[in-house]
Amino acid sequence: MKETGGSIVNLSSVAGIIGDASSLAYCASKGAVRLLTKSAALHCARARYGIRVNSVHPSFAETPMVLDGIARARDPERLRAGLERASPMGRMGKAEEVANTILFLASDESSFTTGAEFMVDGGLTAQ
């Protein structure tokens, strides 16, 4: 990749940005992805490798991991409603919305983007 350039897109989470008292290890690991991304972006840019490194930080999206967690809850409808209320847009994200952000970052359309954090969170971190 050093010779040809390219794009690395790391998948993190808003939990690496805002934290959650009930998910300490998860938040720490996602925060580490955030800083790994920034450090790798600087390294690759300064070395002139032509490699862009960015991160995507989704909030609750309708993915197998999230949907399974909702299904296992004591009151799935209540949990889902709470997650939807937490989003300024009033809904959970869709896996395709996260995927489209990743596709953009992997494409040449983002050729001057490196070290960036993309929140796909319906405005959650804007609050």
Residue ranges and their predicted role:
Residues I18-L24, G90, D108:
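Active-site loop immediately N-terminal to the catalytic Tyr-X3-Lys motif
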Residues S13:
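Residue(s) in the substrate-gating loop at a strand-loop-helix junction
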Residues S29, T37:
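Active-site helix of classical SDR
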Residues V9, V53-V56, V66, G115, ...:
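Hydrophobic structural elements of the Rossmann-like NAD(P)H-binding subdomain
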Residues I18, T63, I102-L103, S110, ...:
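Short C-terminal tail/terminal secondary-structure segment
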Residues F60-A86:
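A glycine/serine/threonine-rich, flexible loop-to-helix segment
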Residues L42-R46, S111:
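Alpha-helical segment proximal to the catalytic Tyr-Lys
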